[in-house]
Structure formats: C-alpha cells, structure tokens
Amino acid sequence: MVAPLVSESQSSSIEETDEQQQQYQQLARRRTIQSDLVDIEAESISSALPEGFNYEKKTTATRFLDKTQKYYPVILNIVHGAIWGVLVRKGLMSLTTYSGSFLSGVIWANFAACVVMGLAIDGEVFWIRLLEEKDYPNKGAIPVYTGLTTGFCGTVSSFSSVILEAFNKAADTDIGVRHHYPNGAYGIMQFLAVILAQFGLSIMGFHMGKQFSAVVDNYLPLVTKRIYKVLELTSMILGVVLVVITCILIGVKKQGSWRSWTFSMLFAPFGALLRYYLSKFLNNKVSNFPLGTFTANFLGTLLLAVFTLLARGKLPGGKGHIVTNTIALHVLEGLDDGFCGGLTTVSTFVVELFGLKTLFSYRYGTISILVCFAGVVLILGSYNWSVGLD
C-alpha cells in the first residue's frame, strides 16, 4: 500500500500549530516565573517592613507586639526619625514651592522619602551580622531600621497632603490662586494630573532606591552588635533631647512664624507612632489589603480636611474666618504638617503596592486614593460650596 501524501498546506498548518504551542508554553513558563518572583518580592518586602502586611491568605501569622518585645527602643527611634522627617519635609516644601509651580513641594518630599525607603528595603549588608547572630528575626524588627523607615521616611512623605492638593486643584481652591476652568469637568483632569504625577514620581523614586542599594551596599560596612547598640542608644537619646528642646522652645518663645515648625516637631511623633501601631495590629487582618496603612491614611486625610476647614473656612455671611488667633493658626499648621503628615505616608504605601500582586496592588491603590478623596470632598467640598474657603 502507498501511504497518503501530506499536502503542503497541511504541513504548514501542523508547523504553525507546533509553533503556537511552543509560544503558549513559553508564555506559561514566563508567567509562572513572574508569579514566583512576585511571591518572593512580597515575602521579602513583608519581612522588611516593620509593620508587615498579609500578602497571601496562607500567611496568617500575626506580627503583633508582645509583652517580651522591647518597646522603648522602637518607640524612641520612631520619635527621633519622625522629628527629623517632618523637618526635612517642611524644608523641602519651602525650597521647592514657588509662584507658578503646578504642584506643591510635597512631590519632592515624597520622592526623596521613597528613594531612601527603596535603599533601606533592599539594603542588606549593613544589617547582615545582626541577622546572622539571630538577635532579630528579620530586618523589620531592628529598632534603628524601624526609626529610619517608619519614623523618618514615613514622616517625610505625606499621603494626606497629596489628596488635599488633588482636591484644591480639582475644586479650584488653591490659596490665593483661581484658575477659572471652562467648566467643572476640567477638575477631573486636574485631579488625575496630581495623582498620576505624585504617585508616579514616588513609585519611580522607590524603584530607583532599590536599584541604588546594589551600588551602595558595596561601600557600607558590616555593623557589629556592639556598634549597633551604640547607634541605637544614641538615636534614643537624641529623640528624647529633641522632644525636650521642642517643648522648651514652645514654652519660651511665644512669637514668630517659626512656631508652626516647633508645633510640627511636637505633633509628628504622635502621628508616626499611631500609624505604626495601626499598621502593626491591622495589616494582617485582611489578605492582600494592608488595612492598617489604609486606616492611618484615611484617618489622617480626614483630620487634615477638618484642620484645613478651621484654618481657611469663612464664617456664614463671609464676615471673617472660623479661626483668627495667630497661635491657634500655628497650632493648626503644626497639626497639619506634624500630626497628619506623620500619620499618613506615601513611602510605606508605595512599598506595599510593590509587595502585592498586580491586581491586588491596583485594587489597594485605587480604593485608598478614591476613598480618601471622597472624604475630603464631603468635608471641605461641602463647606466650600455652601459657605466658602479663603
């Protein structure tokens, strides 16, 4: 018998099918590798964040502070980092906010915080001996590291300021500037412009910091346990000294616009500590959604809206403002920049976005931004449209 001949078209079809199967297999392998890398990244970031977060349902182990953990080193290092953090943020904002700029200087503060956070999260060499000696279960449990990430970076960046700026652009309520959009719908474009620019640059900053860490690690020394204890004690003492100096300055020097800086230094540690404990106790409650950071950002944004209303709100009938006392205004500014700035964070928010899988990352980011913005609209927007803001 003679075997049937295969036509050229059938042969070509078989080859195309084999090629497609190979492409599908390559795509499946690539996605599997990408998924594995995401899991490794999530596990690494979760252990590197002092607050931690539950990136998968299977990781249900809580990271609560227990009675045996040393509270004072963690608390005082966060206090120390938060005070320097609010000073850096206010300084950067003062230097980079100018007439004619579309965005306020908080964009550069958030960028700087995310670069440092990226360096800290990916940097391993400096802490490697402490981890090898099993003094700490992971990098996130080291008090000085907690002060650097949660205290300093978390306070240099401010989530609430970004949302407030997005509202001011969308509602055309910038202080002393009115843009007079052709119609209200252009406010949506302004909102998107602020959000995309602010968080886009912050995400880029974190990615840059992670890349820089590979270079910086080559030049960092290995810190021994003895040297680390000196660093930890020094940081704790400086934290106490800064608090004492701040209280003395507030009590002795009763005049000057710089009082808003001292009030910010006073309130910032309270905001940072509240954020830390909210994240510590709530981040593991919901899988793939850092509830603690979300709660801190939402609460801080609502409080910032209330404080802004008190500072800028007009009285009914337009006969004056709600708050006119100079010291009261300085206290409100201190609460804005200090407490709300310390309570809300972009740097930790961006780290969590990197640590979640793509779908959950977009869900977490979108819900956080929209819910916080809605809260500001309800508080500031309703008052602005019914009574008015200065």
Swiss-Prot record:
InterPro entries in the cross-refs? FluC (IPR003691)
Relate the protein's function as given in its record: Fluoride channel required for the rapid expulsion of cytoplasmic fluoride.
Catalytic activity as recorded in UniProt? fluoride(in) = fluoride(out)
Knockout phenotype, as recorded, reads: Highly sensible to fluoride. Growth is inhibited at more than a 300-fold lower fluoride concentration than in the wild-type. Has increased intracellular fluoride concentrations.
Region (Disordered) spans which residues?
A: 1-22
Q: How does it sit in the membrane?
A: Multi-pass membrane protein
Q: What is this protein called?
A: Fluoride export protein 1
Annotated family: Belongs to the fluoride channel Fluc/FEX (TC 1.A.43) family.
Q: Which residues cross the membrane?
A: 73-93, 101-121, 144-164, 186-206, 230-250, 257-279, 291-311, 339-359, 369-389
> Which UniProt key words apply to this protein?
Cell membrane, Membrane, Transmembrane, Transmembrane helix
Please list the residue ranges that the record places on the Extracellular side of the membrane. 94-100, 165-185, 251-256, 312-338, 390
Species of origin: Candida albicans (strain SC5314 / ATCC MYA-2876) (Yeast)
Q: Which GO terms describe its biological process?
A: fluoride transmembrane transport
Single GO term (MF)? fluoride transmembrane transporter activity
Q: Which GO terms describe its cellular component?
A: plasma membrane
* Cytoplasmic topology ranges: 1-72, 122-143, 207-229, 280-290, 360-368
Major localization class: membrane
Q: Where is it located?
A: Cell membrane
